[in-house]
């Protein structure tokens, strides 16, 4: 059995290389817009016929390129998504889950013609703590993702799983929805809890996500640091 893994994510690429070393007979590529150094590129839109003929399974590990219908119809395609489908499907699930309180986790699912939507093969929830930021939740999601893929890989490879459709359609967030969160309106009214959730949702390592414009017209970037109190020693 020959498998194609497509990934644009450094963490997922490490997992793909691990699977390749363990199981062999796999090719690992990034999409045309990927930025992984030294990883060959594959434009699935231009190579559908070749992929369908050559591979028995296509795995998307955070691949940013949408799969054409002809590819989905021609070969089994499975996606590994860092979200708990059907909640906050699409762009940066943990960001929106910190804000709206919906579940977050990792979902392995068959790919259909909609985004993060197909029948679910396996999934695992990740808790969000009051002191979490997008970055800290995402780090745990990557650990869960690795565990879940390794646990279910044999079934994914062989197709010996039972997939189930999501109970509801859920909701979908696109890149434009994330971009709308980034600019902070200093005159916006609301609770401090709401604003804190938004700031920690936009805090992700060194990324300059949240910003406001000060009185001089200068853009000012904002991150928050949350540190839980250590439990008292007995």
From Swiss-Prot:
Q: Which reaction does it catalyse?
A: dTDP-4-amino-4,6-dideoxy-alpha-D-glucose + (6R)-10-formyltetrahydrofolate = dTDP-4-formamido-4,6-dideoxy-alpha-D-glucose + (6S)-5,6,7,8-tetrahydrofolate + H(+)
Q: Which domain of life is it from?
A: Bacteria
Residues the record marks as active site: 81 (proton acceptor)
Q: Does the keyword Transferase apply?
A: yes
Q: Where does dTDP-4-amino-4,6-dideoxy-alpha-D-glucose bind?
A: 9, 62-64, 90-94, 209
An annotated GO cellular component of this protein is: cytosol
Q: What class of enzyme is it?
A: transferase
Cysteines joined through disulfide linkages = none
Q: What is its EC number?
A: 2.1.2.-
Binding-site residues, (6R)-10-formyltetrahydrofolate? 65-67, 112, 116, 175
Q: How does it assemble?
A: Homodimer.
In Swiss-Prot or TrEMBL terms, this protein is called dTDP-4-amino-4,6-dideoxyglucose formyltransferase
Native organism is Mycobacterium tuberculosis (strain ATCC 25618 / H37Rv)
